[in-house]
């Protein structure tokens, strides 16, 4: 029943009385005038009540619409967990939310203003095909259409029924932009009336759909405030829900005008914290799926404010996991109904009967637990046939034998003690293990003391290595070592001197032997104090490299020079190469040269033994008989004719 009329001029003060109407009431608020008619004579219908709302606008028509609500008794103490009330069920988001709830197995009470406008919703539900449905049940059977006007507080309570969850999807229509009171009446006042009714009905969960940018100013979401401050009124509705004390969940979706249902095939859903997003798009179907998931999992959506958009770069993630990442404003508190039901089920008469015969068993249980505490950590103590890996046991060696015998005994003790798997024997095992730990302190650090066949790496030891051993092992040399080293030094020096004596002359043999004996006598105390630097004194078979011994450089060298030179005075040439002077000197006697060379040879021989060749000649020509110094051609003497 609808009627329209126009009002012009001054504000309305009186309306002619109608014969068939009683209780005429006129209310005025700002520029909007609401005329309410209540009570009819002889038009009452059992179980139904009719009311007419007449909205008066300054420059628009007056519409009178009748809303029929079926009154149903409600029990505040009992709520049906599978029953959900959806406000705004004929809208874009509400109709899809109803279908998603039916897919999850919920029973839905769809709140609409007019049952005639719910025909498309009922037809879409009939075309649904549920995957998991009981035999003989259809989705339409779980749907209830309830006519209710949220601007009237009296009609909301009967429409809720025993619903445990309320989903509010209402909002001012974008088509009625000229209605400046739309955001206030629908987005705030109607939502607040629904919150108050839900509080009095003590519902378990309330889910509210608002928009991005309701709390914090941000572009481009703030542009919506040009539509008569719609974001401000939505924020007022959120505050009313938060202050009510209900278990709430607030969903702030992005733009839903352009995206279609196929939008989810290319764009995945993303959730963000409150006051973080100010732009983005999401489809109505994706928002409906989120609302249905929140109704099914109240512990995941408890006291959360979620902002929803869809992006192509976002990964495909289940909604449950996305909700887990959003923190809750307060800790989750389960509904009291579940706790009462569990308390009634727990006391069963059969439980105390089963506990009486088990009472003596509980007395026997404590000693078993005490025996389990000293359980050995080694698995070899639990099995008789299982032996620990053993290494080859060496024979007794010097001072390490007592420690090895202790360790061998310690490894054999747990095997004998665990022959019978009795809990008493296991208690003795830890005592043996403690002894092993204490005895390990006496273990030698060297592995060569453990195994007989294992020898340390050794270098080849020489035959006469007394001096080397005395230096490395003993603190100082002994008398026997000094005697051996002195004899070796004597043999070396005597052989060197003998070769030089045979080649020079018999006259020089006496001083050479004297020099050799003096060298050996002086070298003997040196070997007792310091280690010889030459390796040839250590090994008997090792000989030093020998160079060809030159012949005596006495009269032979002088004779050869005179014979080869064309002019007399060949000795002058030899002395010239040695001294570097061209002056002639008288020739020396042939006996003086061998004496000098023998002195040089003896000094060289003594220098080889003492490693101090002080009188060694600078010229190499005196050492070798066949080696001659270079000679320059001498000019012939000039004769005066």
Swiss-Prot record:
The keyword NAD applies. It is a peripheral membrane protein. InterPro entries: NAD(P)-bd_dom (IPR016040), NAD(P)-bd_dom_sf (IPR036291), TIC62 (IPR044719). The keyword Membrane applies. Residues 1-63 form a transit peptide. Keywords: Acetylation, Chloroplast, Membrane, NAD, Plastid, Plastid inner membrane, Protein transport, Repeat, Thylakoid, Transit peptide, Transport. Its main location: plastid. Residues 376-638 are annotated as: 4 X 22 AA approximate repeats. Sequence repeats lie at residues 376-397, 444-465, 532-553, 617-638. The modification N-acetylalanine is found at residue 64. Expressed in cotyledons and leaves, but not in roots. It comes from the Eukaryota. Residues 393-402, 485-528 have a biased composition (Low complexity). GO terms for biological process: protein transport. Residues 599-612 have a biased composition (Polar residues). One of its GO terms (cellular component) is chloroplast envelope. It is found in: Plastid, Chloroplast inner membrane; Plastid, Chloroplast stroma; Plastid, Chloroplast thylakoid. Residues 328-641 are annotated as: Disordered. Gene3D superfamilies: NAD(P)-binding Rossmann-like Domain. Residues 359-372, 435-444 have a biased composition (Basic and acidic residues). Disruption phenotype: No visible phenotype, but loss of membrane-bound LFNR1 or LFNR2. Residues 630-641 have a biased composition (Pro residues). Part of the Tic complex. Interacts with TIC110 and TIC55. Interacts with LFNR1 and LFNR2. Component of high molecular weight thylakoid LFNRs-containing protein complexes containing LIR1, LFNR1, LFNR2, TIC62 and TROL proteins. Involved in protein precursor import into chloroplasts. Part of the redox regulon consisting of TIC32, TIC 55 and TIC62. Acts as a membrane anchor of LFNR1 and LFNR2. Has a NADPH-dependent dehydrogenase activity, but only after preincubation with lipids. This is Protein TIC 62, chloroplastic. The lineage of its organism: Eukaryota, Viridiplantae, Streptophyta, Embryophyta, Tracheophyta.
